[in-house]
């Protein structure tokens, strides 16, 4: 059987790792005398390998053609595990579900019959991240099973030392698993744009996280009312439209406005008459033709007329109406500032009251990220503290400062409202959007941290893609504090581990593809 160089290298690496783990025990685990006994049926072999009888018959018909020192692929046992043999015993190592969890299992048999009594085993599991786990085996039915469950991902190497009945030295058996590994060559890695960095200590601002929601900036939101009752003649503005200050939103025919404009016109006419009378009486008084009392009365009438005109003008100004003398009942409702129409409660031909909320206008260039703070966290959230806002449904992020913390707790909820004011020039933050608000305190040194974008959600679990030989492995992690740029890893990753820091979403997509293909 021809073995590729890649396979030879892989097996050689397994032999080397296993040799170190077992204190220099060779792959076969035999002493020289046992070797002779174990190969009585395979005289054609000139190497030091050892296989089960079935494996020898199935895969070693060309025994005599093997050269010395050649390594072979690990044989597969009836349970799908790796099969090893010595002194007439077959030992298979694999994984099996037990009590709802994956465990390492050893099946020992002799002459086709299961053997469990008199067999003892210990082992060690080494993950791609370098983490190791000691394994203890106990009898479970007709096999031996690890007391410790094996968590995902199932990418690891296991070495177990199995002491067989009547044997003075243990048999070293090995199992390698690469379930879920995403294989990428160096060229493929370069094309994807995945950037690999090393996990290590970092300064993270100690903080607390709150669920929140984007809301209108109430300081820049207005309910537009007509201030005059009337009938709607036209509505050029629509909901969702961006409008400028002074732009016409609606035109209303109002009898009240007609009365006010008529009052202004009448006051202006009276003013004109009073001015003419005053000028005449002043001239006559100066010429000593008329009495001073007539002059003073004319001056007083002029001043009263001026006051009447000013009063009528201010009434129109207060409601935002012009001094038009043509269409006396035409009232143009205009935008009080630049903003977006977010609500509209007016239509053509409708009769509206003077206090009806016909439009809601909001300047969305600034919004609030509101969140609720429990009583135990109130002291940790203060005005002016830095905060990071992350969208729950997109990759939008922003930094800001806490602008308000309620001074009173709700009687029922025992919580206080707080908010962060955000600039929103691109309109990325839309009111109603759910967000996560991280409020930061003092800097804290954490032993393991990674880039925030390196953490992906896979089936509801936080995952970091760890770089291994020939690809990446999805490593479940438990995250801690974050400042929006780096995030603390509490469990699942050790310092020095190399991980996908940027564009890890590409690996998540590849993982999803491979899972779908595996499902078919």
From Swiss-Prot:
GO terms for cellular component: outer membrane-bounded periplasmic space; plasma membrane. The keyword Coiled coil applies. Disulfide bonds: none annotated. It comes from the Bacteria. GO terms for biological process: copper ion export; plasma membrane copper ion transport; response to cadmium ion. It is found in: Cell inner membrane. PANTHER family: CATION EFFLUX SYSTEM PROTEIN CUSB, SLR6042 PROTEIN. Belongs to the membrane fusion protein (MFP) (TC 8.A.1) family. CzcA and CzcB together would act in zinc efflux nearly as effectively as the complete czc efflux system (CzcABC). The CzcB protein is thought to funnel zinc cations to the CzcA transport protein. This is Cobalt-zinc-cadmium resistance protein CzcB. The lineage of its organism: Bacteria, Pseudomonadati, Pseudomonadota, Betaproteobacteria, Burkholderiales.
């Amino acid at each position: 059987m021809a073995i590729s160089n890649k396979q030879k290298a892989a097996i050689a690496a397994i032999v080397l790792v296993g040799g170190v783990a077992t204190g220099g025990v060779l792959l076969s685990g035999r002493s020289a005398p046992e070797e002779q006994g174990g190969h009585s049926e395979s005289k054609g072999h000139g190497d030091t390998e050892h296989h089960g009888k079935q494996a020898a018959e199935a895969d070693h018909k060309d025994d005599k053609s093997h050269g010395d020192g050649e390594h072979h692929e690990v044989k597969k046992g009836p349970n799908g595990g790796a099969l090893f043999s010595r002194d007439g015993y077959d030992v298979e190592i694999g994984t099996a579900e037990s009590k709802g969890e994956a465990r390492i299992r050893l099946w020992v048999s002799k002459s086709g019959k299961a053997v469990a009594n008199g067999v003892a085993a210990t082992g060690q599991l080494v993950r791609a991240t370098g983490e190791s786990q000691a394994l203890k085996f106990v009898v479970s039915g007709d096999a031996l099973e690890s007391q410790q469950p094996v968590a995902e991902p199932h990418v690891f190497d296991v070495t177990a030392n199995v002491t067989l009945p009547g044997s003075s030295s243990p048999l070293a058996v090995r199992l390698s698993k690469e379930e879920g590994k995403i294989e990428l060559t160096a060229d493929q890695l370069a094309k994807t744009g995945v950037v690999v960095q090393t996990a290590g200590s970092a300064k993270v601002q100690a903080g607390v996280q709150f669920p929140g929601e984007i809301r209108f900036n109430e300081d820049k939101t207005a309910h537009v009312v007509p201030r005059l009752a009337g009938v709607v003649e036209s509505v050029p503005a629509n909901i969702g439209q961006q409008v400028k200050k002074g732009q016409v939103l609606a035109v209303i025919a109002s009898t009240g406005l007609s009365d006010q404009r008529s009052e202004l016109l009448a006051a202006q006419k009276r003013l004109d008459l009073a001015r003419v009378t005053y000028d005449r009486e002043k001239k006559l008084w100066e010429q000593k033709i008329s009495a001073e009392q007539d002059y003073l009365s004319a001056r007083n009438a002029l001043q009263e007329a001026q006051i009447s005109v000013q009063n009528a003008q201010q009434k129109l100004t207060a409601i935002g109406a012009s001094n038009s003398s043509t269409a006396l009942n035409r009232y143009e409702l205009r935008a009080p500032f630049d903003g977006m129409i977010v609500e509209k409660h007016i239509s053509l031909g409708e009769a509206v009251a003077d206090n009806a909320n016909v439009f809601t206008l909001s300047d969305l260039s600034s919004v609030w990220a509101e969140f609720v703070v429990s009583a135990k966290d109130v002291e940790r959230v203060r005005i002016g503290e830095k905060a990071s806002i992350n969208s729950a449904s997109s990759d939008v992020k922003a930094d800001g400062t806490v602008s308000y913390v309620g001074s009173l707790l709700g009687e029922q909820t025992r919580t206080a409202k707080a908010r962060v004011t955000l600039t929103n020039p691109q309109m990325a933050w839309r009111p109603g959007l759910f967000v996560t608000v991280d409020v930061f305190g003092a800097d804290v040194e954490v032993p393991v941290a990674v880039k925030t974008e390196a953490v992906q959600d896979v089936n509801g679990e936080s995952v970091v893609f760890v770089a291994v030989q020939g690809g990446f492995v999805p490593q479940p992690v438990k995250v801690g504090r974050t400042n929006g740029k780096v995030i603390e890893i509490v469990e699942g990753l050790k310092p020095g581990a190399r991980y996908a820091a940027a564009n890890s979403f590409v690996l998540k997509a590849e993982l999803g593809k491979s899972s779908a293909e595996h499902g078919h």
